[in-house]
Amino acid sequence: MDVHFDNWRFLSRPDKVIVHLLLPQTFFESHHIPFDPNLTFWSQTRFHHLDFPPTRYVKIWGKLYFSLPGLPSKACPGIAVSLVINIEENMYNPFDMTVLKILLNENIYYIKFFHMELFFPYIAPNSLQDTSIEEPFKNVDHIDAILNTTSPVTNLYKNPLGVLANLLQSRPQSSPRHHFALEDPGKVRGYEQPSLLQTDKAMPKVSYVKHKWSILNSEPTVTCVKHIFTKKSYFICSYPTMSNSQCTSVLDTISVQELAHVSPTAVLDAEKAFLFKHQHRFVNTLEHVCKSKNYAIEQHVPVLIQKDEETASSIKDHFTETCFVLESTVSEASAWVRATFARYLNKPKAFWIDYIRLWEEGVHTLGKSVPELKEDVCEEKMWHLLSLNKEFIHCIRNQGCTGVLVDSNLNAWLILPGGFVIKGHYNITPEDILFVGARYG
């Protein structure tokens, strides 16, 4: 596809491998990502070796497709996109990870791919048998290829007899010289020689090297791959005219004893530990505030509720369940991550909110921007403006949903049904801000 060619043409480098993907609509639905032609895409490599920082995000092209020859109907429609994978000395680590960041308006989504699945078509035997190249691959020496595609400028002799015959007879200058100071070997300066300008020998014609370029017409070899995280199918395209150099796994260079100490999920574990640590600390601040006020909470949003023990017990249950759910909600799309990244960029004060679904009812809505809350808004006015937000009011008027509002200063408010609010805080260090800025921007 032309979008694959564009990504390969403008993003390929000696230290990068471009992997071309076809992502069906069902693949986006499994990640709860809207299937929209206005999606924009970015690629980043995160390394298994935790001492190596992730690469910068690279913007890539994506294009919607509705049908492609050879693809099953379940693979259509979809979006064609490419991933930029950083390698070193033609070696890749199967446990490294490349992240596809997807933006739609102000919403950010992430899809993670392990390199073991992205390099699968290049090492699987089945992918080598089914190919669309018409002519078999030939081992061609690069020097021979150059000599066969350029015109000769000197007379070459293919046998010793030709060399001896050349020594016994005089011949005009065998090659054109662009500078008269250059002379043939063995000539004596001052001895009369035929001038290059006086010779009647015609100058050799310039022969341009022509390369056949049929990148857009080449048919790719399409391989179906299972996504490790969701078990959903997607497709990798291998083009004969855009083939990647043969890469070797770093696991082939280490011993079996060393391999036993390698954690395949180290890069995931490190990120989950980071996100869990800050969610856990935030929940602790909420519990500390409740204890300091003898579990008396204030209603900041005017919502009519029943004043009885059953309502009070329900609010307490929502608080307890929210604390458990928050500690397990380790997502780079969370409101506090968006707020931390805004602080990393030194942007003006802004607000984001997470709508948390409790008791496994529904899907969380994370990192949603609240544009009506401006930089100079005070808390009293903040609650008034939120009371005009339909989605916010729908959350606090019904059971099974709570909200976490976070600003760029990392102040956070837990909003329970009925408009009751508990204020906490995310304690973020400068190192944490750099960690978020490098990965979740």
UniProtKB/Swiss-Prot annotation:
Pfam families documented for this protein: Herpes_UL17 (PF04559)
The keyword Amino-acid biosynthesis is assigned to this record: no
Keywords tagged on the record: Capsid protein, Host nucleus, Late protein, Viral genome packaging, Viral release from host cell, Virion
GO cellular component terms, semicolon-separated: host cell nucleus; viral capsid
Keyword Thylakoid on entry: no
InterPro entries per record: UL17-like
Broad class of the protein's primary localization: virion
Location in the cell: Virion; Host nucleus
GO biological process, one term: chromosome organization
Annotated family: Belongs to the herpesviridae CVC1 protein family.
Subunit and partners: Interacts (via C-terminus) with capsid vertex component 2/CVC2.
HAMAP family linked to this entry: HSV_CVC1
Function: Capsid vertex-specific component that plays a role during viral DNA encapsidation, assuring correct genome cleavage and presumably stabilizing capsids that contain full-length viral genomes.
Protein name (record): Capsid vertex component 1
Name of the gene this protein is made from: CVC1
